[in-house]
Amino acid sequence: MHLSSDEVVLWQSGFLKLNLTIVTTWAVMLLLAGGSWLITRRLSTGITISRWQSVLEIIVTMARRQIGEVGLQKPEKYLPFIATLFLFIATANLCTVIPGYEPPTGSLSTTAALALSVFIAVPLFGIAESGLVGYLKTYAEPTPIMLPFNIVGELTRTMALAVRLFGNMMSGDMILVILLTISPLVFPVLMNILGLLTGMVQAYIFSILATVYIAAATRTREKSTS
């Protein structure tokens, strides 16, 4: 038994390794890219639209509303990044219904990469709204004494994002393995359903936290323009 899909090495040449995490990550990305192309290739602005377009419009509308409720005044600016995070994590977790599939979100390297993308995006959005000087001033609020604490807080919350998602996904897998040894017939079905629900919740929480961090980084500019 292995704790992470990182341990499953499919190919190796010297220090180069191709593990299961990389394969499943690219598989999820290709699935999302292919699905997006199929859904958007025949978009219509008429009265009659396809079923898939209806689903897509519902998802986009809900995402924009949720981003706006967090406090961002222009949800469309942040929608591509936030929605991509949610769809990747949700799709990766929902694919656990496929036999033999192990979600890349069960790997600390994947969750760390997702958290790193948020860590990079937050100052970029903040600088775009407030300018470089305006954004850097937020680290000295409410007093310059708080500068080192704010910097440490920025780093630790990024680590928390990665560890939270990894820990929740890993604990779900471990519980499933334990219950399989107790009752191999009933518990797996119930735990798979619970696992899918947990995966969706974790995708939602990760996306919301990313939105909150971006809202905090852009709050100075939005306050000045309101």
UniProtKB/Swiss-Prot annotation:
Taxonomic source organism: Chlorobaculum parvum (strain DSM 263 / NCIMB 8327)
Highest taxon of source:
Bacteria
Question: What topology in the membrane does the UniProt record assign?
Answer: Multi-pass membrane protein
Q: What is this protein called?
A: ATP synthase subunit a 1
Where in or outside the cell is it found? Cell inner membrane
Which is an annotated GO molecular function term of this record?
Answer: proton-transporting ATP synthase activity, rotational mechanism
Q: Which family does it belong to?
A: Belongs to the ATPase A chain family.
Regions that span the bilayer: 20-40, 78-98, 113-133, 174-194, 196-216
Q: How does it assemble?
A: F-type ATPases have 2 components, CF(1) - the catalytic core - and CF(0) - the membrane proton channel. CF(1) has five subunits: alpha(3), beta(3), gamma(1), delta(1), epsilon(1). CF(0) has four main subunits: a, b, b' and c.
The keyword Lipid biosynthesis is assigned to this record = no
Q: Which UniProt keywords apply?
A: ATP synthesis, Cell inner membrane, Cell membrane, CF(0), Hydrogen ion transport, Ion transport, Membrane, Transmembrane, Transmembrane helix, Transport
Pfam annotation, one family: ATP-synt_A
Q: What is the lineage of its organism?
A: Bacteria, Pseudomonadati, Chlorobiota, Chlorobiia, Chlorobiales
Q: Which NCBIfam families match?
A: altF1_A, ATP_synt_6_or_A, PRK05815.2-3
Q: Can the keyword Cell inner membrane be found in this entry's annotation?
A: yes
Q: What GO CC annotations are associated with the protein?
A: plasma membrane; proton-transporting ATP synthase complex
Q: Which GO terms describe its biological process?
A: proton motive force-driven plasma membrane ATP synthesis
* SUPFAM superfamilies hit by this protein: F1F0 ATP synthase subunit A (SSF81336)
CDD domains noted in UniProt: ATP-synt_Fo_a_6
What is its biological role? Key component of the proton channel; it plays a direct role in the translocation of protons across the membrane.
